[in-house]
Amino acid sequence: MMPVSGWRAVSSAPASSSAGRTANRIDFARSPRPTVGVEWEFALVDAETRDLSNEATAVIAEIGENPRVHKELLRNTVEVVSGVCGSAGEAIEDLRTTLGPARRIVHARGMELFCEGTHPFAQWSTQKLTDAPRYAELIKRTQWWGRQMLIWGVHVHVGVSSANKVMPIISALLNYYPHLLALSASSPWWGGEDTGYASNRAMMFQQLPTAGLPFQFQTWSEFEGFVYDQKKTGIIDHINEIRWDIRPSPHLGTIELRICDGVSNLRELGALVALMHCLVVDLDRRLDAGETLPTMPPWHVQENKWRAARYGLDAVIILDAESNERLVTDDLDDVLTRLEPVARSLSCADELAAVAEIPRVGASYQRQRRVAEEHDGDLRAVVDALIAELDI
């Protein structure tokens, strides 16, 4: 009989010696409060052609020194980040404050801000790389796949109080992977073609050698051993080169959720941030209560990722280690109901309630396809519609 907590690996520990792991201990900063922070990636698009514009260097230079605005791998991208916040609503207002001036500079240069998982028709071969050693090294190693990374996403950090909680929470969060991807899926197009997927970004990003689903380690020491092995064998030089869809950020004391496609508007972003915040805090509190968190076998987790990427809100997902299945939107309703008390305690009840609006109005990939159909397949109209959704 399967234990009530779900699937458990007999041992997932890396092969490194205990002495090696001790010498390479990773300190976790710890967050005394369950804080939240957001990283929001934007593409720059030409106001006339609606194609991508490689002008991020000039835009960031005009913005000036600002810890809330960062460069990224490609020169068509700027990243806007929040500070350390107490709630989803606070994070959204923080982002709004930064976006206003940044958007005015972008407009003055004849461009628009655009955020989706992929651009509907841009070609990766015309995009320019940001001048930085770490990006050059990434492309040198990954070659064709690295140059294909014409993708944008949303990353959410949630503070965790102890390193001992991190890996159990990450493993349990994988049960909600398809919910988050289906809700945020916004990348049906690739190079002007409809891929048939709700999130082609999810399929693309996992091609990088250290990206994709995390290993389901049970303890922090197992994660330390994994990082030791990765460094010793030359796979990574720094821990931030582990690009998992959910990963620890030890220096910040957070778990970073990197599942979601790019999000076009602040209301949906606030809803998704609230959902992720509530999920992590709920699991954290269940650990405090002595509960063993439920997990699923990695083959179920992998299948759920694919189903959500392919079918979006129409995905029938695997729920547990017993292989029970359910439509993702039906299960989402129960998840939202269960998280309502958590949301009230985190002052994000309104934002969490807004999650239910996404299936009602259609996720971004569905809205994009509707616009394309209404405009005889003109993908510039899709870009227009998405730009209009960014109401600051």
Swiss-Prot record:
* GO-annotated biological processes: modified amino acid biosynthetic process
Name the top EC class: ligase
**What Enzyme Commission number(s) appear in the record?**
6.3.2.2
Q: Name one GO molecular function term.
A: glutamate-cysteine ligase activity
> Keyword annotations for this protein?
ATP-binding, Ligase, Nucleotide-binding
Q: Where is the composition biased (Low complexity)?
A: 9-19
- What is the superkingdom listed in this entry's lineage? Bacteria
Keyword ATP-binding among UniProt keywords: yes
- One Pfam annotation, family name? GCS2
Region entry Disordered: which residue ranges? 1-21
Recorded catalytic reaction(s): these are: L-cysteine + L-glutamate + ATP = gamma-L-glutamyl-L-cysteine + ADP + phosphate + H(+)
Q: Which NCBIfam families match?
A: gshA_cyan_rel (TIGR02050), PRK13517.1-2 (NF010042), PRK13517.1-3 (NF010043), PRK13517.1-4 (NF010044)
| Family named by the database record | Belongs to the glutamate--cysteine ligase type 2 family. YbdK subfamily.
What role is this protein assigned? ATP-dependent carboxylate-amine ligase which exhibits weak glutamate--cysteine ligase activity.
Name of the protein this chain belongs to: Putative glutamate--cysteine ligase 2
Which organism was this protein described from?
Answer: Mycobacterium ulcerans (strain Agy99)
Lineage of the native species?
A: Bacteria, Bacillati, Actinomycetota, Actinomycetes, Mycobacteriales
